[in-house]
Swiss-Prot record:
This is Monomethylamine methyltransferase MtmB. One of its GO terms (molecular function) is monomethylamine methyltransferase activity. It comes from Methanosarcina mazei (strain ATCC BAA-159 / DSM 3647 / Goe1 / Go1 / JCM 11833 / OCM 88). It catalyses: Co(I)-[methylamine-specific corrinoid protein] + methylamine + H(+) = methyl-Co(III)-[methylamine-specific corrinoid protein] + NH4(+). It is an enzyme of class 2 (transferase). It comes from the Archaea.
Length: 458
């Protein structure tokens, strides 16, 4: 049966008031894991240890499983404790009418984001930045300048302000609104000081409420050609605050970046099950959020990293499948275990950059070093590595990519529990000149040499 009109956030709100009642525990502990397990068995999904898939038939089965996951489960609204269901036609309408390309930024600093394919020879867009990591007020501009000064970086992804005027940006407070505006304004100024005043940014990251997110669209702050973030909840959940934010973004004709990080070992379960949920989450970004692009980020429940063997496999299969069967645009975010100025951090980020570039990601977003949880532990050097590795990987044969990854991941995966803490931005850079220390340059060159020995050609 056809639909009356294309589905949007207003329809979601209406259905969230009348949908099937469900407890959150039942959703998290029964509906999601049971359906994911059922679909894995139904379609016989087995990734056989490949980071980037070569089996097109298995990819098609994965897409069918992800589509079915969204169709049969729907999305859980945490405010109303009800399930929002879509019809099959509504889902296909969203998939068939996605934004096929868009521009981030303005003037000579603008970049065009358009579809890539598995093994594409074009380097993906590099969205460099702290990626939601906490950054102290005192070095907020210098940290973001360190990314804007890197030519490998095309756009900036914001960090979180730990304070504004010395006060915590508590959700719902006037300081949250001030922080959201200040975050985006300072980053715009940092880009201008780096000689790239038209550079696009992605955020806001500091605010946690709808009022905070909406307030970042302001004079001197975010504009329509910046990526505007809205986040889904784990797994296949959303709150009504986010729906209100989507309504604002749509009404303002903003580029919408729908974000979510599926958890391996969490509610979804194992590798194949989590990838099914990841596919469903991708599709939901375009049905519910009318997204311009979806920012992925499979993360390991124990290690808090996106660079593990399991999460790289999930990311590689999810992206390659989305790229093969749809025109949806997808990015991935980077959370290594190790901190800046360590070889491990650079190798972790490199493994993900190889996986993402080869599997067809349009945007690489990072790097949130030290798992993105330690204040001031992120710098432009990690984004440089992400970009250089992407450039070296673009166009490689997938069989060669998997061979490199099978050699690279063992170099760091035994060290998760003892990952080096690394150094703060202030210890990695001259804060006045925004240049990396000699120590970091040597660490960087050492990591680069190891990657060359594995077969990358810079």
């Amino acid at each position: 049966m056809t639909f009356r009109k294309s589905f949007d956030c207003y329809d979601f709100y209406d259905r969230a008031k009348v949908g099937e009642k469900c407890t959150q525990d039942d959703w998290d502990l029964m509906k999601i894991p049971m359906k994911a397990m059922e679909l894995k068995q139904k379609y016989g999904l087995d990734f056989k240890g490949e980071f980037v898939p070569t089996d097109k038939d298995m990819m098609e089965k994965l897409f069918q499983a992800g589509f079915e996951m969204l169709l049969e489960c729907g999305i859980y609204c945490t405010d109303t404790h009800r399930i929002v269901k879509y019809t099959e036609d509504e889902i296909w309408d969203a998939i068939n009418n996605v934004q096929k390309e868009f521009t981030l930024g303005t003037g000579r600093d603008a970049v065009n984001v358009r579809k890539r394919s598995v093994g594409d020879k074009r380097k993906p867009i590099v969205q460099g930045g702290p990626t939601g990591s906490p950054i102290s007020e005192e070095v907020f501009m210098p940290v973001h300048m360190s990314y804007a000064l890197e030519r490998e970086v095309d756009t900036i992804v914001d960090g979180v302000m730990t304070s504004v005027r010395g006060k915590a940006p508590i959700p719902g407070s006037p300081y949250e609104v001030l922080a959201a505006k200040t975050e985006t304004r300072l980053i715009k100024q940092a880009c201008a000081m780096a000689g790239r005043p038209g550079m696009g940014i992605o955020g806001p990251e500091t605010s946690l409420s709808a009022q905070g997110n909406i307030s970042s669209d302001c004079m001197g702050g975010q504009i329509s050609s910046d990526s505007h973030e809205v986040s889904q909840l784990n797994e296949l959940k959303i709150d009504l605050d986010a729906i209100a934010v989507i309504a604002h973004y749509k009404g303002n004709s903003d580029i919408i970046m729908d974000e979510q990080m599926p958890i391996f070992g969490g509610y979804a379960g194992g590798i194949e099950e989590t990838t099914i949920v990841d596919i469903a989450t991708h599709i939901n970004a375009f049905v519910m959020s009318s997204a311009s692009w979806h920012l992925d980020g499979p993360v390991h429940i124990r290690w808090g990293s996106t660079n593990t063997r399991e999460t790289l496999t999930i990311a590689g299969w999810a992206c390659a499948t989305i790229s093969e069967f749809t025109d949806m645009l997808s990015g991935n975010q980077y959370y290594p275990c190790a901190g800046p100025c360590t070889e491990m951090c650079l190798l972790e980020a490199s493994a993900q950059s190889i996986t993402d570039t080869a599997s067809g990601r349009e945007i690489l977003s990072g790097v949130a070093s030290a798992k993105g949880v330690v204040t001031d532990k992120t710098t432009g050097m990690e984004a440089r590595m992400m970009g250089e590795v992407a450039r070296a990987t673009a166009g490689m044969e997938i069989s060669e990519v998997n061979k490199v990854l099978n050699a690279l991941v063992p170099l760091y995966e035994k060290n998760y529990a003892t990952a080096p803490a690394g150094k703060t931005f202030q210890e990695c850079y001259d804060v006045k000149t925004i240049t990396p220390t000699e120590e970091y340059m040597q660490v960087y060159d050492g990591a680069r040499k190891k990657l060359e020995d594995l077969g990358l050609v810079f």
